[in-house]
Amino acid sequence: MVKKKINLKDITIIIPAKIIEKNLINCVDVCKKKYPDTPVIIVLDYLDKKKSLLQRKNIKLVSTGSISIGEKRNIAVNSTKTSFIAFLDSDAYPSKDWLENGIKLLKEKNIEAVGGTELDFPSQSYIEKCVSNAGRSFLVTVLNFRKNLKKEKYCNYLPTCNLILEKKTYKKVGGMNANLVTGEDWDFGERLRKNGKKILYSPNVRIFHKSRDLKNFFRQRLIYGEGIINLLKIKKNFFYFLSLIFLFFLVFLLSFPIVFFYPIWGKIYTNILIFYLAIVFFESAKISKNPLLFLGTFFTILIGNITPGIGTLIKILGFNLNSKKIYKNF
C-alpha cells in the first residue's frame, strides 16, 4: 500500500514574538529551508526596518501591539487557511521531519494535539547549559520528560513552543485565553482534555530550543510564579495548587528569624534545609554530564525554586509585575 504524502502546504507555522531579533530570524531561516512551501505567520508587537529580513515567499507578518502571547496566537489562527497549525517559539527551530512526524501521528493515532522534545542549541554558553540542566530537573520543570528523549506518552498539557494540531480542534475549545500572560498553554491543555481530547508527547516531534541566560531565566520563573495565581482564579486545579509549593518553600526560608525565639524551630529548619539541599546536590550531580557544570546547575536549580515563590507572593500582596516587559526570551 502506497503511503499518502503529507501536504505541507496545508499546515501553517505560527511564531509569536515581541520584536525582530536574531533568534527569530534564525527560526524563520530554518523553517523556510526545511519547509519552503509551508505558510508561516509571524505575529509581532510592531514592525520595524528589519522586517525586510523576514519578507519572503509564504511568510505573513502581523503587527498587533503589546498584547498577550495567547491573543497573538488566536489572531494568527484566525487568519490561517490551512487545516493544521504548528506553534513554534521565536527562540527555537525545527529538527528533521518535525512537521511530517507530527502530522503523521495526528492522522494515525486517536489524538488531537502532539508535541515533542526540546533539544539544546548545539552551541551554548556555560550559564545557558546550567539553565538547560535545571530545566531537565523535576525540581524545576514538572514535565521534565520533554527536555529529554523519553518514550511516547499522553500528557495533561504540552507547551506551545512545540505543539501541532488541527485548526478545527483549536477553534472548538475556544483557542488561547487572551487574558493570561503566562500559563496559557496549561489552561489550553486543560480545556482540551475537558473536551475529551488527547495530547501526545513524542520524542520524534523535535525542536531545538534556546536556553535563557540567568537574567531571563530569573524573569521567566518570576512571571511563572505570578501566573499561578491567575490560573487558580480560572480553575481550582490540583496541578495549579501543587505549583504553590514554591510559595511554601519561600515562606519556609523566610521563617528563619523564628529560630531566635523558638529554638525547636531551629532544629526543624536545619533538618529540612539540609534534606532539601541534599536532594538538589544529588539531582545536580545526576543531570550534569560535565562535572564543571555541577556548581552552576546547583545554584540555577536554587534560583528556579525560589523565584516563582517571590512572583506568587508579590501577586498575593496585591502588586502586579509588568509581565509583558519582564517576560522575554532574548
What is each residue range found by the language model?
Residues 120, 143-164, 181, 187, ...:
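A recurrent flexible, glycine/aromatic-enriched loop bordering the glycosyltransferase active site
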Residues 85:
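Short aromatic/hydrophobic "clamp" motif used to bind/position activated sugar donors
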Residues 97-129, 205:
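Conserved donor NDP-sugar-binding/catalytic core segment of glycosyltransferases
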Residues 9-12, 39, 187:
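Cell-envelope/extracellular polymer assembly enzymes that use nucleotide-activated donors
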Residues 19-33:
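Short, well-formed alpha-helical segments that are part of the catalytic scaffolds
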Residues 246-321:
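Membrane-embedded multi-pass helical conduit in multi-pass membrane proteins
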Residues 177-235:
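Catalytic donor/gating beta->alpha subdomain of glycosyltransferases that bind UDP-sugars
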Residues 64-80, 101, 161:
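Glycine-rich, basic loop-to-helix element that forms the pyrophosphate-binding segment
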